[in-house]
Amino acid sequence: MIYELNHVGGRVRDLEASLSFYDGLGAEVVDRLFMNNSRVHRVHLQVATGLVELLHHEASDPQATYGLNHVGFMTDDLDGDYARLMALGYGEISSPRVAGSGQGRLAFLSDPNGVRVELLQRSEEFRVPPITSGPVQGLSYVAVAAPDVDAAAEFYGTHLGMERVADDTFRLGADAVKLVPTAGSSIDHLGLTATEPAAEAQDPDGNRVVFLPAA
């Protein structure tokens, strides 16, 4: 069963610049490791209530695309959930395998609009209690591209088991996805609740961050 929206993640060009940006939002590093075989640095940051996964490859690649590019969900039955979603006709990206970190197993598929979705089964837990000492009080949502809103709603609501908390927003665990019909990229932006009004920002790889008033 899929039981948690765990993180949003992607590939970063300059790891230290990205860490500095999120540090300015009050984020804290909750996990950091180096995958020697692939020469990839992986960092999990917690931004208030939500996790952001940053992946930095030591080798340069002129063909690489940088920025947030997937949402990750936790499951207690990776093989079963993956097979079920494949039988429903969703696009295969990579079948279940041992994670490069050695921490559990993972698989990737695409939602109806081409957004990369990671399924994870592992015992490690990186999330810590909410970090609210900085300007950001919560990760309100991850905005994902949804030109076909109805198909996306069926995927996230019916087939991933997320709770529909608004017409365009689905929650599972602490975090939520918001469906954006006119998104500029697969992960359109992060919606963060903040103590003070602030202009929209961009991280070093061009990911948009929208600040929302805290309740």
What are the functions of these language-model segments?
Residues 28-63, 112, 116-123, 161-194, ...:
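Conserved short beta-strand elements that form part of the metal-binding/catalytic scaffold
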Residues 32-33, 82, 86-138, 144, ...:
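Vicinal oxygen chelate
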Residues 44-51, 55-103, 109:
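N-terminal accessory/assembly segment that mediates macromolecular interactions
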